[in-house]
Amino acid sequence: VIADINGEEQMYPASMTKIMTTILAIENLKDLNQEITITNDMVADLYVQDAMQAGFQPNETVKAIDLLYGVMLPSGAECCVALADTVAGSVSDFVTLMNEKAEKLGMTGTHFSSISGLHREDHYSTAKDIALLLRYAIKNDTFREIIESPYHSTSGTNIHPDGITFYSTMFKNLSDT
């Protein structure tokens, strides 16, 4: 860090939350080719909250690796929920894992209460803590491969037999400048 201006000021992390969701899923899934079925219960609240989604549908069976790309490239909340449920059994238990990991990483100004970054009063971080998290996550080869990808075409599924192609919102925004 060359300079730090307000690095410890509390802020709302929004989609930066997905860095923690992704790295925890990568570290806790034994097989990234594991197939996971997205249920109606997983996505019902996301429609109400108008959350950004990658395009997977209820009752669709998707490989974990494709869900990971769906989290980071198009910012898919349904992918976050499916991964959290698979890793921890519930979103709330996954949030507990997120806060435990934040503590281990020394993210003293952070408290997670959302897995996708949807706004909640008790969901906050700091620029310094997000930098710590990103520095940690980028050491993981799978995480780095995902975030460096400008696009990803998923494997075919029972609902999307030709797969879905995701384009990175980060690269899209960079090309708009």
Task: Describe the function of each predicted region.
Residues V1-K128, R135-D141:
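Active-site-adjacent loops and short helices of periplasmic peptidoglycan-processing enzymes
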Residues M107-T108, H119-T177:
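Domain-terminus/edge residues, biased toward the C-terminal soluble/receptor-binding domains
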